[in-house]
Amino acid sequence: MEFTAGAPILIVVEDRLRFGAFRTLQSAGVTRQFAKRRTVLFQGEIPRGVLVLETGLVKVYGITNGGDQRTVTLLGAGDIFPVECVFGMSRVSLYYYEALTDCSVLNLPRDAFIATLEQNSHLKDQIFQSYMAHYTSATMHIYALEHSHAQEKLVYILQYLVARFGERQANGLTKISLRLSHQDIAEMVGLTRETTAVELHRLKAKKLISYQRFSYYVNVPLLVQTTGSDEFENVAV
């Protein structure tokens, strides 16, 4: 994977982690460092505690029977995982968690996390807001997957990436502040790398996007006009 975190996005979240309610968790846990591409948690593993991403980006993914990776979501600073274990819905992790950049991860006992959550309404509100953002992101991702045509899948996954990682540029385009290869995008929507490359080139010819190496720029007004989904234009998750 070739993701690179965009600093303007992570600065906001990391400030929340350092100075907001999340800092109440830090005294109860131990921080570990994970190098880029290292697995933080394996599918089927029983986590030893609650994990809080302090800095960096983590990819959540599964592997198909054919051995292909399928990206489920991306986690940023302040996110708590694996949520299914944190809140008692599963004993084991349902997915793999891999560091996309160098990461700092706080590990604390689940009992300490739950006790702090029950006593700290500000922390509870921040976690609620985080999960609502992830829920909105998930619906946008699912909507992209539901389209039958490859180009439509890509248009809607670009819409999701803009909402999650978009940075407006002086020229009016929106930069997706992740370093993305064709393979990375293909894994998000279940396409082959070859099909993804062809369809992205067609979108570039239509001037919906431009890209250089691993950087993507999206013409959001034209993208919205193409999809007719103006309700998504100002979504930020």
PLM-predicted stretches and their roles:
Residues 53, 75-76, 108-109, 180, ...:
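A conserved hydrophobic position in a structured secondary element of the catalytic/binding core
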Residues 23-24, 41-44, 170:
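Short loop/turn motifs at secondary-structure junctions and domain boundaries
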Residues 163-237:
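Phosphate-/nucleic-acid-contacting segments
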Residues 1-36, 80, 85-88:
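Cyclic nucleotide-binding regulatory module and flanking cytosolic helices
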Residues 121-188:
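Polybasic "coupling" helices that flank or enter modular domains
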Residues 21-22, 73-136:
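Cyclic-nucleotide recognition modules
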Residues 13, 38-102:
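Cyclic nucleotide-binding regulatory domains
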